[in-house]
């Protein structure tokens, strides 16, 4: 095609990572790091799983080799909006001997990708994952109920003891919590018994906050402690840890070789940025920024210095400070032709941050994910249940539904009218 935009998109699509064919050459960035586009996560090599277009791709290790990879809005076709719409979806992946992320199979049972959480999907309702984590062999996932992207009604946390085939709800939080600044999160386990979470709104307009909690409190965010960098105290009131020239989008926090690594899409700079610090409890405005993907025109060749409409940014398990793999999303919102998660490789962050990589400890050992038999035999069903932390309105609705369930005929006749009034977490529980 003579259309420069189509040519640019074809250039990206030809990053055939699995065979190391047409992978981009490493690009020297202004700060001295080197960034290489390794290739798209999906392509001809993954057609068998029934998913052709997707974004995000948050990851958590399952063992020393495989990792869970969870995506947002996904489609069976090869462009945004083409084919069946599913969210969230997941695959099991690993990194091959050449350093490429390779999809092995769907996370759910069966040979085709399905929604990980079962719910009635109508209108603009969608469930977008924030992050996934492996704690002592149990997977935990936090996701946001959106009535149209950016319009978060509430968030929910699930757990899985079947390597992601089946999920059970354990916690529900209204978006009034932290004034919405706790909707979008990324979490990581520290070495001190706490799990730490960075958070912001899902509007790409606000700063970054820091929380911590014990595992037994993961389902009750009112028990999470909030950090104030001005006082260096943990209380029930938060202040931003990162706010200067920042409008936080998707984030990923990981503890790697004794350092806290934060990857983030920053809408203020229209770039995917990396920040690394040996201390988490600090003012992150003082941490130097390393850009790994900068927005640019679709009419120009796609590269780390011109990656049109980027977002996301998720660290691949097994990454090290001096060899960091990050999955970056890209969506051409004008044509919807280009909608994909793509692997980037970053070298030289150790030098940029003054870290002697030869002195770094090995990566933390991975506790193998539990692989218990699933009760439903269908990972697509999600196995979800209502949170024990329902608010009063939800409890009231549950009571009403119970009465309606006892009057089967009336319930059937009334269904079209009361279904729309139910909150997403109740629809998910009832699978309607």
Regions found by a protein language model. Give the residues of each.
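Beta-rich carbohydrate-recognition and catalytic domains
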Residues: 3, 7-50, 61-123, 134-178, ...
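Structural signature of eukaryotic scaffold interfaces centered on beta-propeller domains
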Residues: 53-62, 121-136, 180-193, 247-256, ...
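Long, low-complexity intrinsically disordered regions
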Residues: 357-375, 383-386
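Extracellular Ser/Thr-rich, low-complexity/disordered mucin-like segments
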Residues: 375-401
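A cross-kingdom C-terminal cell-surface attachment/processing module
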Residues: 401-417
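Cytoplasmic C-terminal tails of single-pass
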Residues: 421-432
């Amino acid at each position: 095609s003579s259309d420069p935009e189509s040519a640019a998109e074809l250039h990206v699509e030809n990053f055939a990572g699995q065979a190391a064919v047409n992978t981009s050459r490493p690009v020297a960035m202004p700060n001295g790091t080197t960034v290489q586009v390794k290739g798209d996560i999906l392509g001809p090599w993954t057609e068998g799983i029934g998913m052709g277009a997707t974004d995000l791709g948050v990851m958590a290790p399952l063992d020393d080799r495989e990792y869970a990879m969870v995506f947002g809005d996904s489609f069976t076709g090869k462009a945004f909006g083409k084919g069946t719409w599913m969210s969230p979806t997941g695959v099991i992946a690993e990194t091959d001997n050449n350093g490429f992320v390779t999809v092995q199979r769907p996370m759910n049972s069966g040979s085709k990708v399905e929604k990980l959480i079962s719910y009635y999907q109508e209108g603009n309702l969608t469930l977008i994952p924030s992050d996934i984590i492996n704690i002592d062999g149990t997977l935990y996932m936090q996701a946001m109920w959106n009535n149209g992207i950016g319009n978060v009604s509430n968030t929910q946390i699930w757990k899985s003891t079947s390597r992601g085939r089946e999920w059970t709800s354990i916690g529900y939080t209204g978006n009034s919590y932290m004034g919405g600044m706790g909707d979008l999160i990324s979490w990581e386990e520290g070495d001190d018994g706490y799990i730490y979470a960075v958070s912001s709104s899902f509007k790409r307009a606000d700063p970054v906050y820091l929380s911590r909690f014990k595992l037994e409190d993961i389902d009750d965010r009112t028990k999470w402690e909030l950090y104030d960098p001005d006082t260096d105290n943990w209380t029930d009131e938060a202040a931003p840890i990162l706010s200067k020239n920042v409008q936080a989008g998707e984030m990923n926090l990981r503890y790697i070789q004794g350092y806290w690594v934060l990857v983030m899409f920053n809408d203020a700079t229209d770039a995917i940025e990396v920040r690394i610090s040996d201390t988490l409890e600090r003012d992150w405005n003082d941490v130097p920024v390393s850009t790994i993907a900068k927005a640019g025109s679709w009419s120009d060749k796609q590269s780390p210095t011109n990656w049109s409409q980027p977002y996301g940014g998720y660290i691949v398990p097994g990454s090290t400070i001096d060899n960091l793999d990050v999955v970056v999303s890209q969506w051409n919102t004008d044509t919807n032709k280009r909608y994909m998660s793509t692997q980037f490789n970053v070298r030289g962050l150790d030098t940029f941050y003054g870290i002697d990589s030869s002195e770094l400890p090995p990566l933390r050992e991975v506790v193998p994910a539990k692989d218990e038999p699933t009760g439903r035999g269908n990972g697509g069903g999600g196995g979800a249940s209502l949170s024990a932390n329902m608010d009063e309105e939800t409890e009231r609705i549950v009571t009403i539904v119970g009465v309606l369930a006892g009057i089967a005929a009336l319930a059937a006749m009334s269904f079209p009218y009361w279904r729309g009034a139910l909150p997403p977490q109740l629809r998910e529980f009832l699978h309607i």
